[in-house]
């Protein structure tokens, strides 16, 4: 006698326990019931492009091409045959080796700061960097107790002294030493252009009117510390003392994270980098060694002298080349080690020596901050770069450096012929991303053709994908997004209740990982399905 069970709907059938009895329909004895499936999957990535632009593209729109890896993984699913030829399942898929690489040589900078693209048949021309000459920006260094006390004690030139010299000085001229201290030790100009009237008379720097007076943490914690009065007068010793103490407190509260030696080294390195292409034309060697963080007082002094000599040699090389007053003024930095540092350096204690090094380095940084001689040299060098003869020499030098780099690269290749192919490939490529993905989907399948032992089926699915891994060799936060898929496969009846599914599928991601990459894999899988 035939057993007939009516199925109210496909979804209600999914609620049947996996131990439910099979459903026999018709003379063929076709069974409906739960099944489990396990398999392996592999494929390729489609629809993903590099986030990096191709520097050879003049319009700046083309992205670099990627070399993609072949993702692989496994699948695990549970489902139900809900009607003859129709199945519904819930499955999980894990994919790894979702990788992409860009050729390392596609984006690189050569020794003269040129960014270029690898050429194919000589079609891609190098993109040359335009050398911009801008003096290093001033860096405000912490004001030490010794420098603070020195500033407080700076006297004004008295009215009597100016009268005895037949000079009638105003208050600012009498306070010239104090104004110089503000510039050299605090990096502040006493007078600046009026922002409301740039062509009008200069006004007292508003910064000076906003410097809290005295200790930033006064005893008793008053609600607010006083600022200099609106009628601030630099020759007034009481107001000057409060200003210096306030500046020293603020400079130490907002001091740079790097040590004074590191700040000095970076400034000198920038200057050397700025002038190197012109020094090469003049045949002047530019040192490539920076100050160590543990530089001694003597090393700092020698570095400042080296900088002075190099700038003067460069100026002298081009003196008279442009005519006029260009390169006419000698470079004399005249770095003098602070007296306080000299006294500290004479001690034998390590702490005293470290303090002396910091004091000397800070003094050197202050000397370079807004240095008029260096600023004028930069202006002259900017004019020099526009000269036709110098332009031609720069192009010739760049071409020579390109040739040297090419020859060096060929020599390196010959030396590396003994290395393994795998190692070579590793050096030729640069990872763009390396990801793994866990996908959970609900899928519906329908047979489109059935024979005694084989059936061809199609299916659709939707679900969520969780992606993690690295982009540009940096770990990313896990990304979750919607996905949809379509599949076409063949089911082979290998034994009673056992089927082998060979399936091809495509999965589409609706969102981008890190707003850069849309991972759309094209996959092939082999699974074993067992009907209970």
UniProtKB/Swiss-Prot annotation:
Range of residues in the leader sequence: 1-22
Region (Disordered): 401-428
Gene3D superfamilies according to UniProt: 2.40.160.20
UniProt subcellular location: Cell membrane
Topological relation to the membrane, as annotated: Multi-pass membrane protein
Protein origin, superkingdom: Bacteria
Compositional bias annotation for Basic and acidic residues: 403-413
Transmembrane segments: 67-87, 480-500
Main location per the UniProt record: membrane
Keywords, in A-Z order: Cell membrane, Membrane, Signal, Transmembrane, Transmembrane helix, Virulence
InterPro entries assigned to the protein according to its UniProt record, in alphabetical order: OMP/PagP_b-brl, TSA
GO cellular component: plasma membrane
Repeat recorded as keyword: no
Keyword 4Fe-4S in annotation: no
Function (record text): May be an adherent factor for rickettsial adsorption to the host-cell surface and a determinant of virulence of individual rickettsial strain. It is the major outer membrane protein.
Protein name as it appears in the record: 56 kDa type-specific antigen
